[in-house]
Design a protein with these regions (language model features):
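Glycan-recognition and catalytic cores of secretory/periplasmic carbohydrate-active enzymes
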Residues: 1-559, 564-604
Length: 604
């Protein structure tokens, strides 16, 4: 075991004190939040009925940050609550009708991806819970052709048979009731079809169709069943996380083969379409089969509702998963090719470089500033010379945003983290912890003043108030830009364990800061803000997929450095009031990924 000791007292930096205050505060707030909004059995204090296919994801999102927070260093109480609440949400939305066999009956993979973050967090929290492993395998079976009741996978054509899918299988014909609780939301977006009667999408491609008008909605639903219900879309690539999750639990090669084959199928479709990823293929795998031959216009595709986002994000998620499984970064090239296409279509408007975000019958439209988050993630995941060039290309457009927001619970904007990692924003750690604390307190203040009628609350009510925010903690303690919220796994260069308590996460009183993240190394600072000695075991890779290759001491507490070549973990003993700062060399993707804790998992 590679051991580093820190024995020289030093003042604790502000970021470290704030980090520990944030963790301690969220431990308390999680309990108060659950007490305020749930019954004794954990069910949400809400309405008795909830129709339609939307909403279970929002129930899970209301507590979905809890297991990840525990894995970062949250309390055992939060861990216990995370499991109670998952079971309660599952039972409640089963009664409503959205969940079947403990999984969403049918919906799209943007929403599956959001709710599945809860499941992926359980793997990091405790890999030895038998029901977690059983669910991982059972849910993956629904997508790889091993579940007779959920025939989502077409092995012959290498496609998921519908954009709307789940534990009941593909939803090949949608009903008005399926959409009844989501029409208000979609009424704010551009029309999904350019030939809806009464909509002039030719002169105004962003024209809105009123989903709340019954006649208009009937026309939309008819076209949706004709054009979008059958066949595959890139959004379904997010299912690779669920199958990779099963692989991390088991190491079974069938899961790996499925992920790689499915991503390859979309790569081949892209090549067949002249280099642009089509946003739809029909039941036989033909591009535009249900869309009058058009490669655009599919469900969550290049046109509707979000545009390029719904193509690029699944390609990022699937490429990252494939790299995790193989160590081969070329699986992210498909993402890069689409980013390059959009960049090359860019133009200057009012002195600013803009790229298209959507494609319709009239071509590309909805130009705006290029989205930089994908490139930050790409560079953190792979970090080769081409990725560095991509990063520089975006950076040339202007400084990285330093805005710290909390749109989703496990996500924080990656651009401020990138500025810090490059060295241009050294105050980011302190500011990130301070802003996180302020956001937690702001949410607790909202909760204290929340005296409305629960029967009237929106289905997003609780997730918008959940005070357990993990985004900045992932950035600072694990050295990753964030988790891709709509279904990404927690790809990161390191994670920590508490060997004294035999649990994941930072020990009590210990704060961590990862900086200068490079493909071959990171800088790690650990601070013990308390008075008692603490021991931290730091693992190479969130899933033990990396190995450490060297240690360089960067502080004044020098001493003989042990050889850590090919080590999965490094042990730090830190006296009270002391800290340690090291550069850890690493070789990435040297091991099979596993949820197993240090000493428990496979060694290759």
């Amino acid at each position: 075991m590679t051991l580093i000791r820190a024995t020289t007292p030093c003042p604790s930096p502000a970021w470290a004190r704030l980090q520990r205050a944030l963790i301690d505060r969220m431990n308390d707030c999680a309990v108060a939040f659950v007490d305020r909004y749930t019954r004794e059995d954990g069910s949400l204090i809400w309405r008795d009925t909830w129709p339609g296919m939307d909403g279970s994801d929002d129930g899970y999102e209301s507590f979905g940050s809890f297991p990840l927070f525990y894995a970062l260093g949250g309390s055992e109480t939060v861990h216990d609550l995370s499991r109670k609440q998952w079971n309660a949400v599952t039972k409640q939305f089963t009664a409503y009708g959205q969940v079947y066999r403990e999984y969403d009956a049918y919906y799209d993979w943007m929403h599956h991806g959001e709710s599945n973050l809860y499941l992926y967090g359980f793997g990091m929290a405790d890999p030895n819970v038998a029901i977690d492993r059983e669910r991982a395998l059972r849910f993956a079976a629904m997508y790889i052709g091993e579940d007779d009741e959920a025939q989502n996978w077409d092995a012959e054509h290498r496609l998921i048979r519908s954009p709307i899918n789940g534990s009941r299988g593909p939803r090949l014909n949608m009903t008005a009731e399926d959409w009844c609780t989501h029409r208000d939301v979609l009424a704010n977006y551009l029309t999904p079809y350019e030939d809806v009667p009464g909509i002039d999408a030719i002169s105004d491609p962003m024209a809105i169709a009123d989903w709340n008008d019954d006649e208009t909605f009937a026309e939309i639903l008819k076209r949706m069943n004709q054009r979008m219900a059958r066949g595959d879309v890139p959004l379904n690539l997010t299912a690779t996380s669920l199958v990779t999750h099963a692989y991390i639990h088991t190491g079974d090669e069938k899961y790996k083969r499925w992920v790689l084959d499915y991503l390859d199928a979309w790569r081949e479709r892209t090549e067949a379409n002249g280099g642009i990823t089509p946003d739809n293929v029909g039941p036989t795998g033909k591009i535009g089969e249900c869309m009058d031959g058009k490669w655009w216009g599919g469900y969550y595709g290049w046109r509707w509702p979000h545009g390029a986002f719904s193509i690029l994000e699944p390609l990022l998620i699937a490429g990252a998963n494939a790299q995790l499984l193989t160590g081969d970064g070329s699986h992210l090239d498909l993402l890069v090719s689409q980013i390059d296409i959009l960049w090359n279509l860019g133009r200057t408007e009012d002195g600013e470089f803009v790229t298209p975000n959507r494609h319709g019958d009239a071509g590309w439209f909805a130009y705006g500033r290029p989205v930089s988050s994908y490139i930050v993630h790409l560079n953190a995941l792979r970090g080769n010379a081409d990725d560095a060039a991509q990063l520089a290309r975006y950076a040339a457009l202007g400084p990285w945003s330093r805005d710290i927001s909390f749109f989703k619970l496990t996500q924080s904007p990656p651009e401020p983290w990138q500025a810090f990692n490059e060295g241009s924003d050294p105050d980011y750690p302190e500011r990130a912890m301070q802003r996180s604390l302020e956001e937690v307190e702001g949410r607790m203040d909202q909760i204290a003043r929340d005296d409305g009628d629960p029967a009237e609350w929106d289905v997003h009510h609780w997730q918008n108030l959940n005070p357990v925010l993990t985004g900045t903690l992932v950035q600072l303690t694990m050295g990753a830009p964030s988790i891709i919220y709509h279904g990404g796994l927690c790809h990161a260069p390191i994670r920590h364990f508490d060997p004294a308590q035999q649990r994941p996460g930072l020990p009590e009183d210990v704060a961590a800061l990862v900086s200068d993240v490079r493909p071959e190394s990171i800088v790690l600072e650990l601070v013990n803000v308390g008075s008692s000695k603490r021991t931290v075991q730091t693992q190479a890779g969130a899933f033990a997929e990396h190995v450490f290759t060297s240690i360089e001491r960067l502080d004044d507490d020098v001493g003989p450095l042990p050889d850590c070549s090919a080590s999965r973990t490094v042990l730090f003993e830190i006296d009270g009031g002391c800290s340690v700062r090291v550069r850890l060399g690493m070789r990435r993707y040297a091991n099979r990924p596993t949820y197993a804790r240090p000493g428990e998992g496979p060694q290759s």
